A protein has these predicted regions:
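Hydrophobic alpha-helical connector segments
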Residues: 70, 84-109, 163, 188
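Hydrophobic/aromatic residues within well-ordered alpha-helical segments
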Residues: 21, 64, 71, 75, ...
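Basic, helix-initiating cap at the start of DNA-binding domains
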Residues: 1-36, 40-49, 66-69, 74
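Amphipathic alpha-helical packing segments from all-alpha helical-bundle domains
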Residues: 80, 125-168, 185-196
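Short secondary-structure transition hinges
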Residues: 98, 105-141, 153-154, 175-176
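Short hydrophobic/aromatic patch on the recognition helix
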Residues: 51-61
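Short hydrophobic clusters on alpha-helical segments that form packing/core surfaces
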Residues: 25-33, 79, 103, 170
Length: 199
């Protein structure tokens, strides 16, 4: 018997229709966040935009922060796909700098969406933890693309350290961009400095 303070979560695979409905909800939330920021992503408005009953939204997501964590995964995945498909400088530090600066540019171009995703990622809601994990995983993809996949335990440890440090610098820069009125150029300069110092 499980101790009384243990939480057990059961999951089941979604049918094709359920998966399509869930994706439609995430797309609706992404559109609302892009149009009006965090405050625009209410469960009621997401349901209306997706053309489903409000109860349907709660069947898939526990809160708007949970929903925005999925928006984060979708949007950041699309941005990283675009970054990794670009022609990059051959030198690893230059390649890393180019990718991080482009990520800042895209975030500035979609400031309301960036603000919504960051607000969810820094929320105390436990269901939004996936947002932070998505952010770190995306940074890992950037590092792998720019620097190559590490092949020794020492290189893997160094890559983990780089991911941790650059992740904090990037998060701080994006919060400055979306919440404190910093310009895209200021945040790009911050990323250039960070890469120069850690590389």
């Amino acid at each position: 018997m499980a101790p009384s303070n243990t939480t057990i979560t059961l999951t089941r695979a979604l049918t094709r229709d359920q998966q399509a409905r869930r994706e439609r909800l995430v797309r609706a939330a992404l559109d609302l966040a892009a149009e009006g920021g965090y405050a625009s992503v209410t469960m009621h408005d997401v349901a209306d935009r997706a053309g489903v009953a409000r109860a349907t939204v709660y069947r898939y997501f526990t809160s708007n922060d949970h929903l925005l964590s999925e928006v984060s995964a979708l949007w950041i995945g699309q941005v990283i796909d675009e970054l990794t498909s670009r022609r990059l400088p051959a030198e690893p530090a230059e390649s890393l700098t180019a990718m991080l600066c482009r990520l800042v540019q895209v975030s500035a171009e979609h400031r309301l969406l960036t603000e919504a995703i960051l607000q969810a990622a820094t929320s105390p809601d436990p269901s939004a933890e996936a947002s932070h994990e998505n952010f770190q995983g995306s940074l890992g993809r950037i590092l792998d693309t720019a620097l190559g996949t590490p092949d020794t335990p020492e290189a893997q440890a160094r890559m983990a350290d780089l991911q941790h440090v650059l992740g904090h610098v990037l998060l701080s820069g994006l919060l400055g961009l979306s919440h404190r009125g910093r310009s895209s150029e200021e945040v790009q300069d911050l990323m250039r400095t960070a890469v120069r110092l850690v590389m």
